[in-house]
Amino acid sequence: MFNPLRDDLMVQQQITNSWEHMVGVIMLNQTGRKAVKTTLPEFLYWFPTALALLHADEEFAKSIIEPLGMVNVRYNRLIRMSQDYLTWDGNDAEKLFGIGKYGSDSYEIFFKKNYAVQPTDKELKRYLEQEVHNVS
């Protein structure tokens, strides 16, 4: 019913707004990208905004993210991040619950177009080298 995200692009390259981005970051935590690329489209279909998730049935939301594992931890992070997101000023992503350095670096790169970021994540490094700085 839901098409997975493309394998040849990073999750961050296939989402359209910062809340979706933060959801993707939380889903990617300790989870393979392939599983997230399958689960994220369905999750965003049912919960396209922070408010939609905050008003959703908890068990239904958990059933969608269940294939990713750590269901209770992940669900609680998504809820707390969504609560923070409603009053977030859009600057420092690490102020959102559950968003650490990886999420902050990713947000800087994909949404703020700040390519001076020095990520420690290998995929973000590779993206900057190959897609932004054209280093082979």
Briefly describe each language-model feature range.
Residues M1-G90:
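N-terminal polyanion-binding entry modules of DNA glycosylases/AP lyases
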Residues E20-M27, L78-V132:
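Catalytic DNA-binding helix-loop module of base-excision-repair DNA glycosylases/AP lyases
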Residues Y45-H55, K101-G103, Q130-E131, V135:
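Short, mixed-charge aromatic SLiMs
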